[in-house]
Amino acid sequence: MSDQDHSMDEVTAVVKIEKDVGGNNGGSGNGGGAAFSQTRSSSTGSSSSSGGGGGQESQPSPLALLAATCSRIESPNENSNNSQGPSQSGGTGELDLTATQLSQGANGWQIISSSSGATPTSKEQSGNSTNGSNGSESSKNRTVSGGQYVVAATPNLQNQQVLTGLPGVMPNIQYQVIPQFQTVDGQQLQFAATGAQVQQDGSGQIQIIPGANQQIIPNRGSGGNIIAAMPNLLQQAVPLQGLANNVLSGQTQYVTNVPVALNGNITLLPVNSVSAATLTPSSQAGTISSSGSQESSSQPVTSGTAISSASLVSSQASSSSFFTNANSYSTTTTTSNMGIMNFTSSGSSGTSSQGQTPQRVGGLQGSDSLNIQQNQTSGGSLQGSQQKEGEQSQQTQQQQILIQPQLVQGGQALQALQAAPLSGQTFTTQAISQETLQNLQLQAVQNSGPIIIRTPTVGPNGQVSWQTLQLQNLQVQNPQAQTITLAPMQGVSLGQTSSSNTTLTPIASAASIPAGTVTVNAAQLSSMPGLQTINLSALGTSGIQVHQLPGLPLAIANTPGDHGTQLGLHGSGGDGIHDETAGGEGENSSDLQPQAGRRTRREACTCPYCKDSEGRASGDPGKKKQHICHIQGCGKVYGKTSHLRAHLRWHTGERPFMCNWSYCGKRFTRSDELQRHKRTHTGEKKFACPECPKRFMRSDHLSKHIKTHQNKKGGPGVALSVGTLPLDSGAGSEGTATPSALITTNMVAMEAICPEGIARLANSGINVMQVTELQSINISGNGF
């Protein structure tokens, strides 16, 4: 046994580094907390082995140990896999410290190898596979070429250790060295080291050597609302209140739309010229475009409908960024070779607001530039004035103000536009509350365009024309309605002049007039040349009824008198005025004068018979004159000129007589057709059958009905002349019909009536006369 003891003394002493991966020694998972111990084989033969369990009394021979050592060197993986115990799941490695250096850093241990290469040794404990009854421990040294474990820590990542693998050492280690950082909107931030060296070896592992000065690089792939910590960029919405008299220069345009309420929702939008200001309606929401930084980014920052303050900002610098708070509007104006005028107003719910940001904006280029200065007022109003700076350019273009009102709900502030006749093209806007608004004055500038009102007028020849009126110094009281209506009153005067534009004198304001009504004084209009006055009260005494027809404000219809003249004014695109006479001859619509209570003179007929004097038969003065249609291929002959004119209207397709019944609006060529159509609305049946109680609306229907009675009854041929009186004919005390009732007398020829029928008619009170020779006589009240 002494020889064996001496042979065991020759075993080389090694430094054993036991790495307890499972946590037996309390070390870290990466190899921290290694225990160093120097062991030596003794003759006692009693040693502790984690794989074998207890000591053995008999020792193997040196030849057996040599054979076991050689087998371990040749197939280390096989022996390691077959004989590894349950307590060595993490493995125990021994590194040779003869050629390595160990240094301790702030976050762990670091083993630095020399340039000549390291030869780490590994000692694995297992039982002897050849000797099943023995659990002895064998310790041998083996050399693993090209590879070591390095425990390193990055200097800039807190408590994050980087485990890098060198060539030849377990290339299947998975680890994560860069933590994931996300912003509030869910986008990941990428870290890139300045001057970092990234190396990749043959086994697929990437070694990152980080440097100093880590920077955060935001992801620029998507254009979300990312607020990056970049220089020259504001981090929050800042109201611009410190630009008292600062002058901003540049050429970038910033245009916005601000709702301004003027009897509706009216927005003053910028126009392309200094000499024009257009008022157009828009929605309540305002769009604000703000310039970005050098990154050319824009960000709308206004929201909400309640406005607490109004700010006026003008900027032309492309490298500046402006923001407003969430309760204010930001309006920007630019003057780049043109004049742009913006009006802003401030308003709140029910009360008037006060301007908060007195500012002045300059940066003027060109002769048409503007200088807008916004001052703070004390009465809860915001005034902005613009003045012309630089050289006064010669402006020949007139200014025209167009107002298109819309309805506004809520306590929005109203905008009163006062254009005073001042020099220098100065406008003053004042935003006042709706509760304190009593009257609105709209005054035109001296060199501004006219306020035009187009009214339909009637010429001396009966033509309807549109007359343009130019109003100056107009004052409207209580502008509460959406439209301005010219309402005719009792003493209204209709003016007709030859000139297209007429300048009116200043109109005095009425004390109390309805909302939205402009009163036109007849005394002022009477001073104009060519005026004709129609007294509506005198029309009723003369027997003329006034009706309201759609399309024109006035229609004059004569009551059934001598000839039943009816005059209708129809505004059908400047068409002539058409009249229809029931029994008169020679009336022409071209010479009708709208005079009160006076008939128009008759005009000679222009038909071919009248021109050639062939209408009246030669030598027979008692025969009536006839009128023939001049249309080629027609040749119809009429006894009255009114009938001929109605026939000519049928040729031309003209229908001047329109039904004024509600929701009807049908038009007819002749007046009797209109009267017959009106009976369909009223249900009146004025034609009664003499033999039965049936009644009819039309006389031709009655004639057809009487023929049915004649066919049923046979007898001697007897012709009767029966005069019927309508039910609605109001007979006077003397038996004469009043002028208000239209008396229609129908001569009905009755043939082959039996004597019983004649006796029945006589008993009913109808005058029955027996005539021997019957002549066709038409004395119908409608004249046709």
UniProtKB/Swiss-Prot annotation:
The 9aaTAD motif is a transactivation domain present in a large number of yeast and animal transcription factors. The record marks L65, L66 as: Cleavage. Residues 1-95, 111-144, 282-303, 333-398, 566-598 are annotated as: Disordered. Interacts with ATF7IP, ATF7IP2, BAHD1, POGZ, HCFC1, AATF and PHC2. Interacts with SV40 VP2/3 proteins. Interacts with SV40 major capsid protein VP1; this interaction leads to a cooperativity between the 2 proteins in DNA binding. Interacts with HLTF; the interaction may be required for basal transcriptional activity of HLTF. Interacts (deacetylated form) with EP300; the interaction enhances gene expression. Interacts with HDAC1 and JUN. Interacts with ELF1; the interaction is inhibited by glycosylation of SP1. Interaction with NFYA; the interaction is inhibited by glycosylation of SP1. (Microbial infection) Interacts with murine minute virus NS1; this interaction allows high levels of viral P38 promoter transactivation by NS1. It is found in: Nucleus; Cytoplasm. Residues 263-497 are annotated as: Transactivation domain B (Gln-rich). Transcription factor that can activate or repress transcription in response to physiological and pathological stimuli. Binds with high affinity to GC-rich motifs and regulates the expression of a large number of genes involved in a variety of processes such as cell growth, apoptosis, differentiation and immune responses. Highly regulated by post-translational modifications (phosphorylations, sumoylation, proteolytic cleavage, glycosylation and acetylation). Also binds the PDGFR-alpha G-box promoter. May have a role in modulating the cellular response to DNA damage. Residues 498-611 are annotated as: Transactivation domain C (highly charged). It holds the Pfam family zf-C2H2. One of its GO terms (biological process) is gene expression. Residues 23-34 have a biased composition (Gly residues). Residues 111-125 have a biased composition (Polar residues). A zinc finger (C2H2-type) spans 627-656, 657-686, 687-714. There is a cross-link at K16 (Glycyl lysine isopeptide (Lys-Gly) (interchain with G-Cter in SUMO)). Glycans are attached at S493, S613, T641, S642, S699, S703. Keywords: Acetylation, Activator, Biological rhythms, Cytoplasm, DNA-binding, Glycoprotein, Host-virus interaction, Isopeptide bond, Metal-binding, Nucleus, Phosphoprotein, Repeat, Repressor, Transcription, Transcription regulation, Ubl conjugation, Zinc, Zinc-finger. The modification N6-acetyllysine is found at K704. Induction: Up-regulated by traumatic brain injury and hydrogen peroxide (at protein level). The modification N-acetylserine is found at S2. Phosphorylated on multiple serine and threonine residues. Phosphorylation is coupled to ubiquitination, sumoylation and proteolytic processing. Phosphorylation on Ser-61 enhances proteolytic cleavage. Phosphorylation on Ser-7 enhances ubiquitination and protein degradation. Hyperphosphorylation on Ser-103 in response to DNA damage has no effect on transcriptional activity. MAPK1/MAPK3-mediated phosphorylation on Thr-455 and Thr-738 enhances VEGF transcription but, represses FGF2-triggered PDGFR-alpha transcription. Also implicated in the repression of RECK by ERBB2. The modification Phosphoserine is found at S2, S7, S61, S103, S613, S642, S671, S699, S703. There is a cross-link at K16 (Glycyl lysine isopeptide (Lys-Gly) (interchain with G-Cter in SUMO2)). The gene is Sp1. One of its GO terms (cellular component) is nucleus. The modification Phosphothreonine is found at T280, T455, T641, T652, T669, T682, T738. This is Transcription factor Sp1.
